[in-house]
């Protein structure tokens, strides 16, 4: 009887609340703001730890990117910040030419891909010393990324003031964003380097990892998993966990949480950024994706988006 009253009270308290609006307010906006602050810190001191901090905060924003669906003008914004697995050209060789160019920093960085975190990684980690030229270029690159991050933040703040979608659409957006993120985690960020993806079956190669130069690929994966936890773990507001439990999906949700922990535990015991030993990590990522895409989404009665080979 007491439990029933508690559940009823909880339902009444959260009766008019919406998951996406709470996520934007409590997760998305703080994550973007943290990334902006870390970018500014990195501008002041281009060191290894500051780069890792910025990278991890950005991965959280990217993993839970709702802005492109809320305002289609910003659908491609993440690709102005990060081109991993979305670029056919050799960015590193192009950035080498940018450094050697006599043009001023803004002119030299004329392509969008030159102003991404991937380009920044090359600036900082291509050798053991950061030259004056590389510092100048890095500041311009970070200014560009900060500008895009400010735009993302504005999209979220605008939507909070005037939501334009219905609650059912919003709920579907949250779960489908988690599904797409888990697919990219499995295929792009683990499978391509570990030799478990369909594209590179039985051909493990650490050089394919997302942040091979800076040895931050595991750190990026860990940050993405932290972002997932921000959604699926219980919070003091009406959240995805409360919604899932209301729909009778508590068991399916616990499987998701367990798989995230399993992956984070495995990251701690693996040699740093060594994907040649990441079979277990890949299998856990596969289980996580299936827990979202098969079990949880079915229990929630939400239609999943069909993912193509690129996870889009």
Report residues per predicted region.
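Sec-dependent N-terminal signal peptides
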Residues: 2-12
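Mature extracytoplasmic or organellar-lumen-exposed domains after removal of signal/transit peptides
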Residues: 16-312
